Amino acid sequence: MEETPRSVGEASTTNFVAARPSAKTDDAVTMRGCGFANLALVGIDKEELRGRLAMPEYLRIAMRDCIKRKDSTEISDHLLLPGGAAADMAPHAPMVVFINPKSGGRHGPVLKERLQQLMTEEQVFDLTEVKPHEFVRYGLGCLDTLAAKGDECARECREKIRIMVAGGDGTVGWVLGCLGELHKDGKSHIPPVGVIPLGTGNDLSRSFSWGGSFPFAWRSAMKRTLHRATLGSIARLDSWKIVVSMPSGEVVDPPYSLKPTIEETALDQALDADGDVPPKAKSYEGVFYNYFSIGMDAQVAYGFHHLRNEKPYLAQGPVTNKIIYSSYSCTQGWFCTPCVNNPALRGLRNIMKIHIKKANCSEWEEIHVPKSVRSIVVLNLYNYGSGRHPWGNLRPKYLEKRGFVEAHCDDGLIEIFGLKQGWHASFVMAEIISAKHIAQAAAIRFELRGGDWKNAFLQMDGEPWKQPMKSDYSTFVEIKKVPFQSLMINGE
């Protein structure tokens, strides 16, 4: 399972498949976002753009009222079939924007004002005031109610509406998760989502060609961004459900994205486990779009998050954050402490077994955990850690030798790779070498069992937590593909 040098390849694109962007494509998007191509934007007229995006006023008011009342079934009579309704035409590309004012530093409030100028006030939602699930349930529900009563304009807006999210990867995932409820309810016409990057890593934004950072010349760039959002093709994105099952009675402080199940569950007693399978288990479940990891990288992230929460004055910007993060990596032993000095710092195979299901296979298969690996990452996107590509662009001969296929974010497979000591991780993140390729899988089951380790450190899409372990009972982490795919707008 040797590392392999990277090979450079051009990405292919289609109207419906999210292909891996090449470095050239990503750089071009970043240049556009930073205003280098703004001379080409002169032809985008502000009023013409507004006409393509803005829904009729009566629909905007009806949606606003339904969201405020949290009821999409009762709509004021004067909004049902207003005078002249036949003359109201649906815009070419009805759109709403969710903005996280806590992202992007000082840009949040002024960006909200700028978007309201380009669209309408009612079509820009502040996430501190209107949550995504409220819009999905009551805003889209309002359009469904009006359409069911014969309002053709409402029906067309509901079918064509697109969503832009101004925030980081966590905010985008939040919106995608709420839209997933439409799939569960059997609804059609799921709105696709585009991104205005306001976060730190912005890997979802990079993966769909929306750039890796908030544009420098942002006021003029917003016209171009919204225009691209009206024209962009639709791509698909896999998402993955994670279930963490531990012995009943264990106490864990999970991240926001991981929710406890209502009832205790009984685990399959036929599981091939090193430790005993508890008769009853407490379970938490959630969904991730980018990555899940176990090991030293999660431990460093956990310590950094706690330090930042306890002493926020230390983390005043991205440069300071990176310095603190690097220092914390060293004090935790990833760089500066030999792996053999402390049992708690040894390879993950001392506490872990991994089983996978390959594509079109119903049987679990155990895979080898390399002894040198101190972090294991399960990656869905091509981009990781602010645009790095740890899986790499692998040559066809290597793919054939390992039994791999070229990785895509919509192929129903997920990549598993390992990071060794901190220096190895640094070379991987610098894209000098690829990570330790372990497997591609359609489903994964981790078994964690204590001993010298009392806790394991896990993280999901950047949210870390400390997972208690027992030596007599196993803790299981199971990852399976969500049966439906999210829809994304390509920014190219």
From Swiss-Prot:
* Coiled-coil annotated spans: none
Residue span(s) of domain DAGKc: 90-248
Say yes or no: keyword 4Fe-4S present: no
Q: Which InterPro entries match?
A: ATP-NAD_kinase_N, DGK, Diacylglycerol_kin_accessory, Diacylglycerol_kinase_cat_dom, Diacylglycerol_kinase_pln, NAD/diacylglycerol_kinase_sf
Task: Provide this UniProt record's keywords sorted from A to Z.
Answer: ATP-binding, Kinase, Nucleotide-binding, Plant defense, Stress response, Transferase
Q: Name one GO molecular function term.
A: ATP-dependent diacylglycerol kinase activity
Q: What is its EC number?
A: 2.7.1.107
Record has Nucleotide-binding as a keyword: yes
Q: Report the catalytic activity.
A: a 1,2-diacyl-sn-glycerol + ATP = a 1,2-diacyl-sn-glycero-3-phosphate + ADP + H(+)
User: A GO term (biological process) for this protein?
Assistant: phospholipase C-activating G protein-coupled receptor signaling pathway
| SUPFAM superfamilies (alphabetical) | NAD kinase/diacylglycerol kinase-like
Q: What class of enzyme is it?
A: transferase
Say which family it is in: Belongs to the eukaryotic diacylglycerol kinase family.
Subunit composition and interactions: Monomer.
PANTHER family in the record: DIACYLGLYCEROL KINASE (PTHR11255), DIACYLGLYCEROL KINASE 7 (PTHR11255:SF115)
**What name is this protein filed under?**
Diacylglycerol kinase 7
What taxonomic classification does the UniProt entry list for its organism? Eukaryota, Viridiplantae, Streptophyta, Embryophyta, Tracheophyta
